[in-house]
Amino acid sequence: MSLPKVLILCQPFNNNFGGGITLANLFSGWDKNKIAVVCTSHIFNNLNTEVCDTYYVLGEEEHKWSFPFNYMQRKVVSGEVKVSNEGGAENPVATKITLRSKIVNNYFYPFLEYIGLFHGISKITLSEKLCKWIDEYNPDVIYAQAGVRETLVFCLLAESYIKKPMIFHVMDDWPSTISQKGPFKKYWHNKIDGELRAVLDKSEVLLSISDAMAQEYKKRYGKVFKTFHNPIEIDFWKSHQRNNYELGKTPTILYAGRIGTGIQATLESMAQAIDIVNKDLVNPVHFILQTNDKPAWVDKYSCVQHKALVPYADLPKVFAEADFLFLPYDFSEESIRYIKYSMPTKAPEYMVSGTPIIMFAPAETALVIEAIEGNWAKVVTENSIPKLAEAIKQLVLSENERKQIALNAVRIAEEKFNSETVRNNFRKVIAGIVKQ
């Protein structure tokens, strides 16, 4: 199959964010000369260069901030960057988040959102330099992701200029939560909804992250979405796939990934549940948190140990060495709106690892529905620490149940998320719209 030249908007290839991991796995094996990315400097880090090494960084010539916020931004040079392996595919561990970044992301931006300024203080334009670069690259097709207003509007601008078919891929239901606070929330919700619908109208193909999302978006937007979730390299994960379900003297439950919207409170709930379980068990259970930042509550619990993120290449071994993998979603209304139709990138990776999965999440989420249907996880759908503790205890005491849910998970992952099958279907979709 002859593969077209693709221009990717607003999402780099990386191994520390779901959108980047999914992107890398979907486009793996593509000719590097036929892939380029346009993105802001804010997400230009921890790059995976195995698939793509050509980037245009949206700097001060395109990324414009209103006064006085323009004085608070670092000066970034616009233009093409050729990325080497250093700091990319060979070292994809997340960079240390600075105190400045924490303050800006956790306090400053939420404050701006509340007072109604966040969605209007910056925009991305098409500079003469960027247009020239796009003309020289001359893509056949556009692939885009967006999660904030400025990137959404930029997708419209880019499609209008390039005049080539566009594929728009939605990773989670951010349209439902992008404007939920402050006196101007209705204004921004309606405005962004209109801009999103314009992007959907301009797109030749629409992609969702789950079947549940595709069904919901058909009702909400009247559009047909095809589902493409993160595929997995079966052989890569089989290199350390767990096949022994006996427990050691200190059983471990591992959570590896991000802490943020939709995944916060349930992590501490797990620590509290383990404290309850350990009162009844001879061999205490330990909770390993492998995250970028150490939560403030960790030191309150003797059962919890925080570890830094590891290179992506080490994950099969790390997952297989754990006795259980924890897959949580928070139960707040805001969290449910955000994650209801999502399928976390780590889900198929957890599944194929062979390690039993404990899921603590609302019953209405796509993730829980699929897990219950396939019986590939021990699922707790009530926001109850005692019930979570009871589920943990049941799994610790039942090797048969541990083995059954783990084998189900492996089988379904190999059938549904096999990268060879998913990638071939993805290529057919892209090649098909270029030929039209």
Spans of features found by a protein language model:
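N-terminal subdomain of nucleotide-sugar transferases
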Residues: 1-87, 225, 233, 274-280
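Membrane-proximal helix-turn-helix segments that form the acceptor-binding/catalytic region
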Residues: 25-26, 128-132, 150-153, 157-161, ...
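Conserved nucleotide-sugar donor-binding subdomain of glycosyltransferases
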Residues: 78-141
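Carbohydrate-associated surface elements
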Residues: 212, 230-231
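Conserved catalytic-core segment of nucleotide-activated headgroup transferases in glycan assembly
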Residues: 233-239, 243-300, 305-313
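Nucleotide-sugar-dependent
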Residues: 262-265, 313-317, 325-351, 357-369
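A charged, aromatic-enriched C-terminal amphipathic alpha-helix characteristic of glycosyltransferases
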Residues: 383, 387, 397-430
